[in-house]
Amino acid sequence: MPEPAKAALLPEDCETTEDLFLYGLHVEQYRHATYHPEDYYLEGLRRDPTDIRLNNVYGRCLLKKCDFAGAEKYFRKAVEKSIRSNPNPYDYEPYYNLGLSLKYQGKEKEAYDVFYKAIWGGSFQAPGFYELACLDAKTGRFAEALEHVNESILRQ
């Protein structure tokens, strides 16, 4: 018989930023009635304001609440640190999320450039190419839109 589930520690009782990140994801995934993932992410960011994972997931929380400018700040922090030592980061999710936050603010030219960077990462190629196709179509570049949507489909 499996072990019964254990309650998440309170944010202030977590020892590491990794614990805060993982408990926050758990609370977010299972929509706990009394715990809030933001509390875990913010405690982690209080301890380490440069943590890529925490900046990205907290930005995602703000994105879901339509605080696009607020989300942009956290995604930028995640991107900045992820390319501190290498122009090609391990994970391109912060780039993709930054692109979304820019697009939703009407900063479509900048979003386009950021989505182009996001397609360098394997897991964000399909959604990144899709977003490029949408922006191409919106500006009447239909040949490019078709090319990008086909690339998106190929990478599904």
Predicted regions and their residues:
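Structural motif corresponding to the intra-repeat A-B loop/turn of tetratricopeptide repeats
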Residues: 30-31, 65, 105, 139
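Structural marker of alpha-solenoid helical repeat scaffolds
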Residues: 47, 80-87, 121, 154-155
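Residue-level recognition of tetratricopeptide repeat
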Residues: 25-26, 60, 100, 134
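Start-of-helix register in tetratricopeptide repeats
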Residues: 18-19, 53, 93, 127
